[in-house]
């Protein structure tokens, strides 16, 4: 470390202390959205996303699926990092409940994850997404199942 993670990372990703292939973060769907992981660790993390026209629904505001996706991704990465330090294995999402609280159409949003429950079989994480003025635009909870290592 420090290792930049995600597409167009401008700051190094800090606090990653477990054996995870950082090159895999920010690939796939995260890359399509433009998610950048800023800080990650077993107790939570931060990701950012700059809103552009691709992420808007027909009425000019951010599509709710964008928020659901950031929430799912950050919760999954956070849960995986915790599990890697606490016995190993893999996590899979089993429920994503996202509330859309404020409509925006531009700017950069920041998502922050924090654990609610981390147990032997399941984890529950809360993610809050704020805009550049620190207003909450969405929040969500993701329940994840801990699976044994194969």
Which role fits each region the language model picked out?
Residues 11-150:
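Terminal targeting signals and extreme-terminal segments of soluble enzymes
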